[in-house]
């Protein structure tokens, strides 16, 4: 039985997978079971910030596995303490709750907001405002928070207590605020919603408004956090600090870990309020700490900013050459999106893969670029050249 046959027979069909089996990786490249190499601009969907088989991360995981993998949160472990110290020293947060994924981190934020609403604001049924086209996860609470009905189909009744408003529209958001509003949960850049950057003026107005109304401002940094945008956290581009923010994806460099981060005044969980069996285990924390230290040692946040500017400029040239099919490019750092005038993103992703470049869509009309933060100038140029070749051979059906 082949790998793909085993998947077909024994793995639930929750993904429409590409017909390729990856067996190894190094740097920004993956190699499939037939020995073919691919330039990886997906990075596990904005996760493998150090690329594949990075020696520091590999050594940290191997060494920790030889020492201690898991004991539960009934006890103290040095790896969790060190990681929490690093995150709070480098961010607006004072305290951290560790879990295993972005959905779990956002689930924790939702619970924190509800407790804040009930115990601090005295709201019997707290409400959370989210944005249309947002994505916060696939658990019942986070898929309800997600502002995309396609992810909610078949899963009603949804969790009550969520209101959705247009992204980057302060007046629309303010109009939905009531005495029951406890929090706003929003992304600095909408990732799955089409790589839509947050507007600075919107977020600064939102920050002031939330402070005035004692509403929690919670940022979902699952995709933007840990250097992806050319700053360590996405909120740094916006000139604000959140009360609460969530991390995952890049935090572990491919090892599952998530984090709910909060300022001390809002870190109101008590024993019994929330928990995670695996959250913050020594193995995951050792991996995440290696990622954090490597981001600094190799100046990868700076690299994300510089290579992001190079990528954005190259995408801009593609926009000019291939109009009207390609409408615009947008993003920050190494989180870029190429916006099409037709729903052909999946087709272009497939054609690019055939030419050895891995990309991922963000909706039917947006191609997303989220390479490892170690990506070089040569590799960015290689990706742009492959993509240019794909567009050059693509039949254009849009009329000017």
Curated annotation (Swiss-Prot):
Catalytic reactions of this protein: N(2)-acetyl-L-ornithine + 2-oxoglutarate = N-acetyl-L-glutamate 5-semialdehyde + L-glutamate
Binding site for pyridoxal 5'-phosphate: 102-103, 135, 220-223, 277
CDD domains, alphabetized: OAT_like (cd00610)
EC id: 2.6.1.11
InterPro entries: AcOrn/SuccOrn_fam, Aminotrans_3, Aminotrans_3_PPA_site, Class-III_PLP-dep_AT, PyrdxlP-dep_Trfase, PyrdxlP-dep_Trfase_major, PyrdxlP-dep_Trfase_small
Pfam families: Aminotran_3 (PF00202)
Residues annotated for N(2)-acetyl-L-ornithine binding in this entry: 138, 276
BP GO terms, sorted: L-arginine biosynthetic process
Gene Ontology MF, one: identical protein binding
Cofactor note: Binds 1 pyridoxal phosphate per subunit.
Cofactor: pyridoxal 5'-phosphate
Gene3D superfamilies found in the cross-reference section: Aspartate Aminotransferase, domain 1 (3.90.1150.10), Type I PLP-dependent aspartate aminotransferase-like (Major domain) (3.40.640.10)
Compartment(s): Cytoplasm
PTM sites of type N6-(pyridoxal phosphate)lysine: 249
Pathway linked to the protein: Amino-acid biosynthesis; L-arginine biosynthesis; N(2)-acetyl-L-ornithine from L-glutamate: step 4/4
Any one GO cellular component localisation term in the record: cytoplasm
The entry's keywords: Amino-acid biosynthesis, Aminotransferase, Arginine biosynthesis, Cytoplasm, Pyridoxal phosphate, Transferase
Additional comment: May also have succinyldiaminopimelate aminotransferase activity, thus carrying out the corresponding step in lysine biosynthesis.
Assigned protein family: Belongs to the class-III pyridoxal-phosphate-dependent aminotransferase family. ArgD subfamily.
Quaternary structure (record): Homodimer.
UniProt protein name: Acetylornithine aminotransferase
Source organism of the structure: Gloeobacter violaceus (strain ATCC 29082 / PCC 7421)
Highest classification ranks of the organism: Bacteria, Bacillati, Cyanobacteriota, Cyanophyceae, Gloeobacterales
């Amino acid at each position: 039985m082949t790998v793909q046959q085993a998947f077909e027979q024994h793995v639930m069909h929750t993904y429409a997978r590409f017909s390729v089996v990856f067996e190894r990786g190094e740097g920004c490249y993956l190699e499939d079971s037939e020995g073919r190499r691919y330039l990886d601009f997906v990075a596990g969907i904005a996760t493998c910030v150090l690329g594949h088989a990075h020696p520091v991360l590999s050594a940290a995981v191997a060494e920790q596995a030889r020492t201690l993998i898991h004991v539960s949160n009934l006890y103290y472990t040095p790896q969790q303490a060190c990681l929490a110290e690093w995150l709070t020293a480098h961010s607006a947060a004072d305290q951290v709750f560790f879990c295993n994924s972005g959905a779990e981190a956002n689930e924790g934020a939702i619970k924190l907001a509800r407790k804040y609403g009930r115990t601090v604001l005295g709201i019997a049924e707290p409400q959370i405002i989210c944005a249309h086209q947002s994505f916060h996860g696939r658990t019942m609470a986070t898929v309800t928070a997600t502002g995309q009905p396609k992810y909610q189909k078949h899963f009603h009744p949804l969790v009550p207590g969520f209101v959705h408003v247009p992204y980057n529209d302060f007046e629309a958001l303010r109009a939905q605020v009531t005495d029951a509003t406890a929090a706003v949960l929003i992304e600095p850049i909408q990732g799955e919603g089409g790589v839509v950057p947050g507007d600075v003026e919107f977020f600064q107005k939102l920050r002031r408004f939330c402070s005035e109304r004692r509403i929690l401002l919670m940022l979902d940094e699952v995709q933007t956090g840990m250097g992806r945008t050319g700053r360590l956290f996405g909120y740094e581009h916006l000139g604000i600090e959140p009360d609460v923010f969530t991390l995952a994806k890049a935090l572990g460099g491919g090892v599952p870990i998530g984090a709910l981060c909060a300022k001390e005044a809002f870190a109101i969980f008590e024993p019994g309020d929330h928990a995670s069996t695996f959250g913050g285990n020594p193995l995951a924390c050792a991996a995440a700490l290696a990622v954090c230290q490597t981001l600094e040692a190799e100046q990868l946040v700076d690299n994300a900013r510089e290579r992001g500017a190079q990528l954005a400029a190259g995408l801009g040239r593609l926009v000019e050459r291939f109009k009207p099919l390609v409408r615009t490019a947008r993003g920050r750092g190494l989180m870029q999106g190429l916006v099409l005038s037709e729903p052909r993103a999946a087709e272009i992703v497939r054609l690019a893969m055939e030419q050895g470049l891995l990309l991922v869509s963000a909706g039917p009309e947006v191609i997303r670029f989220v390479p490892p933060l170690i990506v070089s100038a040569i590799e960015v140029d290689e990706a742009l050249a492959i993509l240019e070749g794909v567009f050059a051979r693509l039949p254009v059906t849009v009329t000017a």
